[in-house]
Amino acid sequence: SIAAPDEGGSLRVGPRSAGAQPGPIAYGRGGTEVTVTDANLVLGRLSAKHFLGGTATLELEAARDGVARLAADLGLTDVEAAFGVLRVANATMERAIRVISLERGHDPADFTLVCFGGAGGMHAADLAQNLGIPRVLVPRSAGILSALGMLLADYVRDYSRTLLVPTHELVSETLESALRNLETNAVADFASEGGDESDLVLERTLDVRYRGQGFEIAVPFGNAFVETFHEAHSRRYGYSDSSRDTEVVNVRVRAVAKRARVDLARADLEGPDASAAVIADQVMLGLEGEESAKLLDREQLRPGNEFAGPGLVVEYSTTTVVPIGFTCRVDESFNLILEPGAGK
């Protein structure tokens, strides 16, 4: 995402993006506008010499020059400008997390933040701290987690039909007939792709709403689906009204065929000493000055290893930032677990 002053002189991050070509200034491919990647690099949250597992080098001085130009436009110091870029980017991600948690009746404190993608690990701890999420899980090979998920995911197809019928006028046979027709289509499609019907699991749901609303809530099909809707509405929006008329907008069938599960690598826990994974010192810039951090090679970290921030864990597909005030440990599945704890 590109960072630049808006028409009013305030810092805006995104939605414009430098993409992969030309990419961030630090890529050295002709990019001229500061991106979140450049800000992370300038602040020492990326290692210029260990990008892509050490197979590529980022242009730190070029990124610094770009951030300096942005800082001058904003009337800030270089460090303030770089931190501003990260804060604006984090605020955007925080809003997205709130939409799928707090606004749906879920407390972020009850969950673990799983981060993935090349940049996920650089922002996850800050997001968790700001949202009150108690821990962060960085999967092994986090940068390619989506690709791995695609290869291992179950076969899923969704089918739907619009009814838009008030529930008090609805005849159960009408629902059953509509759902059976969708299931017939699902089975036929699966068979046409060489699937065995015995491997298919069919899940029925209904989109229900109060009459007059412009949005629906999906609830499992069953004899008590109206009561289930009231309960779901209360959880998500903080209220429900059993005296109001409801209506079924859509009937849905999800066809799922489970794939064989793949056993990912696991290992017994070893000791907490992570010093064998330390490959260099890293200077990280804060608003109050420099911070001395450790640079660790994720491939050398073993289950049971643990260290306190600040630190950077580098690997081919991503970098994980462990800020001051967080500890990082490796579990039996080689996941990194970041939690608030004793930092330096």
Name each model-derived stretch:
Residues 2-13, 18-22, 27, 34-35, ...:
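C-terminal, non-catalytic interaction/recognition modules in large multi-subunit enzymes and RNPs
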